[in-house]
C-alpha cells in the first residue's frame, strides 16, 4: 500500500484522529502546540490510499544559535506501532520533512509500553515487544537514548502514574487515602470545580509549592494559555476553607466534649483519657484556626489542581498547596474528586504525571495513593539529520538544561 506524508493537517482533522486513538495523549494534541508558545508546531500525519489518516504527530520545533534546530514529538507520534508499514512510512516521511526544513535532529518519544504494573507488583517482567520496537526504530536510523530512571535525562518522564476507570475505583483506594479524605472533610474544607477566575488563586498555590520544594513550575500566564487552548475541557479544582464557619463548628464540638467530661462518672478513667485527648486536639485546632483568621481573614485557599480532558483521557497537569495549611491533606480529596468526575464523563484513564523510575521517592508514594498503574515507556530516540553537528547540539542543549535547573 502507498502512503502519503502530510506536513500540515488542519487542527480539526488532526484532533479527530488523535482523540479516538488508543495512544491518545494531551501532549500530542493540536492545542498543546498552541500552549507551547516558545516552540513552532507542525501537525503532521500519514494518509493511506483511501484517504484515511492512519498516523499523526505533533512536532514542536525549536531553533538554536548558528542556524541549528530540533524537532520534538512529546509522547508521539500517534500510530499503531504493530502495523510496521504505517510506522515505517510515517517515520521516514518525518525525516524527509525534517531534511527539507534543514533540521539538525529529530527527537521522538513513542508511547510504546515496556511495563505497566501496580507499585506492589514491580519489577515484574517487561514486554518483549518493546525491545523489538526499539530495534526496529534503530534500523530506521533512530538512536535510542537508553532506559534512564531519573526525571532529568528525558524531556518527558519515562514513568507515569495512570489510574484506570473501574467500577470499584473508590472501593479500591488505599485506606490511608480514604482516611485523608475524611480528615479533610472533618476540617470543614470544601473541594469544588471552579472557573477561569480561580487561576489567580491557583497561581498563588503554585508559587507556594515552588518555594517549598525549590523548583520552578509555571506562572498564571501559562495557565491562562492552557485555558485559551482547551476551553471547557480545562478543569480547575480548588480546596477552600471558611475559617469562621470552621471555628464555629469546632467550638461546638469542643463544648460537647466538655459536657461529656462533666457528665462522666468518676470510675471510667479510660473513657476520661479519650475525652481529654479529644479536648486537647480540638483546642489545638481552634488556636491554630484563630491564628489563621487573624493573619489571612475568613476565606482561605488550601490546595488546588489543574487538568485537561482530551479524547478519552484526563491529564492532571499541575497541583499546589498552601504551605500554612499543610497539615490538611486536601490534595487527596482533590485528586479523587477529579478522577471520579472524569470517570463519570466516560474517561478511560486519569494520568497524574511522571515519577522517577526508581519508584522509591515521596512523589511516587503520593501518587500511589490513587491506585494507579506505573506505566514505563521506552523513552526517547534521536534521529541525527545532520550527523556531523548532532552531538555538539545535544551537548549544548543538555548543558543549558542543567544550568536552568540550578
Label the predicted regions.
Residues 6-50, 54-67, 115, 120, ...:
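A conserved beta-strand-loop-helix scaffold within acyl/acetyltransferase catalytic domains
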Residues 7-8, 119-168, 344-406:
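Active-site/acyl-donor-binding loops of N-acyltransferases
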Residues 72:
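Catalytic phosphate/metal-binding cores of nucleic-acid and nucleotide-processing enzymes, i.e., regions
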Residues 75-83, 122-123:
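The substrate-binding groove and active-site-proximal loops of carbohydrate-active enzymes
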Residues 79-85, 356-360:
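Acidic-and-aromatic substrate-binding clefts and catalytic sites of carbohydrate-active enzymes
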Residues 84-96, 327-340:
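Conserved acetyl-CoA-binding loop-helix of GNAT-fold acetyltransferases
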Residues 99-119, 343-354:
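Conserved GNAT acetyl-CoA-binding A-motif
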Residues 320-329, 354-358:
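Short, contiguous acidic/charged loop-to-helix segments that flank catalytic cores in large enzymes
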Amino acid at each position: 500500500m502507498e502512503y502519503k506524508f502530510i506536513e500540515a493537517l488542519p487542527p480539526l482533522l488532526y484532533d479527530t484522529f488523535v482523540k479516538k486513538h488508543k495512544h491518545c495523549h494531551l501532549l500530542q494534541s493540536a492545542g498543546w502546540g498552541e500552549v507551547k508558545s516558545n516552540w513552532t508546531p507542525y501537525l503532521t500525519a500519514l494518509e493511506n490510499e483511501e484517504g484515511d489518516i492512519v498516523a499523526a504527530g505533533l512536532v514542536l520545533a525549536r531553533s538554536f544559535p548558528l542556524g541549528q534546530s530540533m524537532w520534538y514529538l512529546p509522547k508521539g507520534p500517534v500510530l499503531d506501532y504493530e502495523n510496521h508499514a504505517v510506522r515505517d512510512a510515517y517515520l521516514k516521511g518525518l525525516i524527509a520533512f525534517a531534511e527539507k526544513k534543514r533540521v539538525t535532529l529529530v527527537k521522538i518519544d513513542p508511547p510504546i509500553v515496556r511495563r505497566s504494573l501496580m507499585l506492589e507488583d514491580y519489577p515484574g517482567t517487561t514486554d518483549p515487544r518493546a525491545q523489538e520496537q526499539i530495534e526496529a526504530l534503530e534500523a530506521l536510523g533512530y538512536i535510542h537514548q537508553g532506559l534512564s530512571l531519573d526525571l532529568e535525562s528525558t524531556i518527558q518522564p519515562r514513568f507515569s502514574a495512570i489510574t484506570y476507570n473501574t467500577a470499584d475505583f473508590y472501593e479500591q483506594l488505599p485506606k490511608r487515602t480514604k482516611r485523608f479524605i475524611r480528615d479533610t472533610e472533618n476540617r470543614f474544607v470544601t473541594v469544588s470545580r471552579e472557573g477561569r477566575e480561580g487561576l489567580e488563586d491557583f497561581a498563588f498555590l503554585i508559587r507556594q509549592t515552588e518555594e517549598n520544594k525549590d523548583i520552578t513550575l509555571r506562572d498564571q500566564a501559562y495557565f491562562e494559555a492552557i485555558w485559551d487552548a482547551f476551553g471547557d475541557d480545562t478543569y480547575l479544582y480548588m480546596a477552600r476553607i471558611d475559617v469562621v464557619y470552621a471555628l464555629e463548628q469546632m467550638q461546638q464540638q469542643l463544648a460537647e466534649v466538655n459536657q461529656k467530661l462533666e457528665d462522666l462518672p468518676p470510675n471510667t478513667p479510660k473513657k476520661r483519657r479519650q475525652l481529654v485527648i479529644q479536648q486537647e486536639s480540638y483546642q489545638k485546632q481552634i488556636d491554630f484556626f484563630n491564628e489563621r483568621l487573624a493573619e489571612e481573614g475568613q476565606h482561605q485557599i488550601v490546595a488546588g489542581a489543574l487538568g485537561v480532558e482530551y479524547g478519552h483521557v484526563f491529564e492532571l497537569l499541575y497541583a499546589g498547596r498552601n504551605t500554612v495549611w499543610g497539615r490538611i491533606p486536601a490534595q487527596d480529596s482533590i485528586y479523587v474528586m477529579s478522577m471520579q468526575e472524569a470517570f463519570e464523563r466516560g474517561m478511560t484513564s486519569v494520568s497524574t504525571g511522571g515519577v522517577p523510575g526508581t519508584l522509591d521517592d515521596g512523589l511516587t508514594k503520593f501518587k500511589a495513593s490513587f491506585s494507579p498503574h506505573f506505566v514505563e515507556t521506552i523513552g526517547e530516540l534521536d534521529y541525527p539529520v545532520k550527523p556531523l553537528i548532532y552531538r555538539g547540539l545535544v551537548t549544548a542543549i543538555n548543558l543549558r538544561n542543567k544550568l536552568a535547573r540550578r
